[in-house]
């Protein structure tokens, strides 16, 4: 068996570069600060915003993540304790719904970015996430037909201290396919 000091910096990137989708049972980020933004319980200094230009965001039929202070009990699943949101996917490049997550970073540094969503019957395979980091943007297409109800790693990025529009994550309802985009 490999230790985390080999798996995280070497083995996981090799597998991902080869096209594998890697789920790890342990945290891959070395950052000691953790920021969680959830639609159910916005935390002080963070912002969760839904913008509707085409339809609305609605609750998903299945439960979603809920932030919990303290320790979890045996068999307690935080991804079954809250709600999640969904919107009808659109092909429009100009009119779409958007969710913005804006953290308040306690210090400048490198932070891993994870997203959560629910996999539902008509989930799209190309949900569009954009990570804004120090004013730069990196866009990802995420297959929401798998990996729902857990944390999905997007990458590790440099962020400035504090809360700023230049440091945020956005999810849009844009897709090349008919279906549903979910967010949690």
Write out the residue ranges for each language-model feature.
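Glycan-processing catalytic domains of CAZymes
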Residues: 1-30, 156, 160-162, 171-173
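Extracellular carbohydrate-recognition regions
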Residues: 26-63
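Short beta-strands within extracellular/lumenal beta-sheet-rich domains
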Residues: 76-105
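Surface-exposed coil/turn segments at beta-strand junctions on protein surfaces, enriched
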Residues: 92-96, 106-108, 147, 160-164, ...
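A short beta-strand element within beta-rich, extracytoplasmic domains
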Residues: 97-121
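Short, surface-exposed beta-strand/strand-loop-strand elements in extracellular ectodomains
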Residues: 119-138
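Extracellular carbohydrate recognition and processing domains
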Residues: 134-164
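Short beta-strand-plus-loop segments that form exposed binding edges in beta-rich domains
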Residues: 169-180
């Amino acid at each position: 068996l490999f230790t985390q000091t080999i798996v995280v910096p070497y083995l996981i990137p090799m597998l991902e570069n080869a096209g594998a989708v890697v789920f790890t049972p342990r945290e891959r980020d070395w950052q000691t600060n953790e920021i969680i933004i959830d639609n159910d319980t916005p935390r002080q200094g963070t912002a969760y915003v839904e913008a509707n230009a085409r339809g609305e965001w609605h609750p998903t039929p299945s439960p979603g993540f809920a932030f919990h202070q303290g320790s979890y009990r045996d068999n307690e699943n935080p991804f079954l304790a809250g709600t999640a949101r969904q919107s009808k996917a659109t092909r429009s490049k100009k009119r779409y719904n958007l969710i913005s997550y804006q953290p308040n970073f306690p210090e400048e540094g490198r932070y891993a970015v994870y997203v959560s969503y629910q996999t539902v019957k008509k989930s799209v395979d190309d949900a569009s996430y954009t990570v804004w980091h120090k004013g730069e943007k990196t866009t990802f297409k995420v297959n929401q037909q798998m990996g729902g109800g857990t944390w999905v790693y997007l990458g590790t990025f440099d962020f400035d201290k504090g809360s700023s529009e230049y440091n945020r994550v956005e999810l849009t309802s844009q897709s090349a396919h008919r279906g549903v985009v979910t967010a949690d």
